[in-house]
């Protein structure tokens, strides 16, 4: 059973010889500083460097997938924000939000992939990484997190409370753009789409607003991916207790959770597959025997796909990540 077959079977709920161990990319970025030493160009912007980094994540660390990009800023770039493109030490980040009204942002933006050089680089990288044996994951920043990367989160959250209709229209506009971006990824060769939406937590939005603003977007996104036979993983940060019943209504192939979530509890509440949730703080700091213990516990808790629980720090040691992948593969 090769790596692509194993992961696709796991996402369908079919029997596998063991759980896959992956790091999708995007927010869950394993292109850490130590890995990037011999890659001279910026892996966030340069096509050759992006492809090389994705390959090294698998070959050096042992994660069983290729995944691009390595950040959460590509999606917001066409909407008039100022971005730091990152380097070997720092991930890309938003430096300045678009200060315009939401209506004006929608009128003035033309978020075609061909107009966004970095997204176009991601699409080309997926095409280069496409193969028969190793799954390629295209990473999408979710609609709430993309919206709050374009405009100041405080501004959008105020609008959610005071001008909900206008906020909903904007988030839906962003979601439609993300759907088209994901379709381009699939056309280029992505086997799976992973959505990370760290701003869309029950703790930040509350259950009522999560159901009103996030759930309809996920539902529409998933419908579009079903139409092109593409499995989807959704990652939600934070404590998901208040929204877990809502998540159970999604027709999604896997849900990924932060380390704060008890996976046995999640397993009892959800009908879909679970991914996660080895603490990224533990992966950063060790010790290695504790990493093995927590990885073993994740599998014992019913996790179908083993992965880091959230975004990895750029200073995470390769050896700590390798301990996790080696354990899952039976090398330890």
Predicted regions and their residues:
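Segments that shape or occlude catalytic/ligand-binding pockets
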Residues: 32-71
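Intrinsic-disorder/low-complexity, polar/charged segments
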Residues: 45-47, 96-104, 116, 286-287
């Amino acid at each position: 059973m090769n790596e692509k077959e194993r992961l696709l079977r796991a996402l369908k709920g079919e029997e596998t010889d063991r759980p896959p161990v992956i790091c999708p990319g995007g927010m869950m970025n394993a292109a850490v500083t130590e890995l990037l030493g011999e890659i001279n160009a910026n892996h966030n912007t340069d096509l050759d460097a992006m492809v090389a980094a994705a390959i090294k994540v698998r070959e050096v660390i042992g994660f069983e997938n290729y995944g691009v990009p390595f950040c959460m800023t590509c999606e917001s770039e066409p909407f008039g924000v100022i971005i730091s493109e990152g380097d070997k030490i720092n991930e890309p980040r938003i430096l300045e939000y678009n200060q315009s009204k939401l209506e004006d942002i929608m009128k003035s933006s033309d978020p075609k992939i061909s107009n966004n050089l970095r997204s176009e680089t991601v699409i080309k990288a997926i095409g280069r990484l496409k193969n028969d044996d190793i799954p390629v994951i295209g990473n999408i920043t979710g609609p709430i997190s993309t919206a709050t990367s374009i405009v100041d989160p405080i501004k959008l959250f105020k609008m959610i409370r005071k001008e909900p209709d206008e906020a909903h229209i904007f988030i839906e506009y962003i979601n439609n753009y993300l759907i088209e971006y994901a379709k381009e990824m699939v056309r280029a060769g992505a086997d799976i789409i992973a959505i990370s939406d760290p701003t869309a937590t029950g703790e930040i939005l509350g259950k009522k607003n999560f159901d009103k603003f996030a759930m309809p977007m996920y539902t529409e996104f998933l419908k579009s991916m079903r139409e092109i036979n593409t499995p989807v993983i959704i990652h939600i940060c934070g404590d998901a207790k208040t929204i877990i019943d809502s998540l159970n209504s999604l027709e999604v192939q896997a849900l990924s959770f932060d380390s704060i979530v008890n996976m046995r509890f999640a397993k009892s509440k959800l009908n879909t597959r679970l991914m996660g949730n080895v603490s990224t703080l533990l992966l950063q700091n060790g010790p290695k025997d504790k990493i093995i213990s927590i990885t073993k516990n994740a599998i014992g808790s019913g996790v179908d796909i083993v992965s880091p629980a959230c975004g990895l720090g750029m200073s995470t040691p390769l050896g700590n990540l390798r301990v996790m992948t080696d354990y899952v593969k039976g090398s330890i």
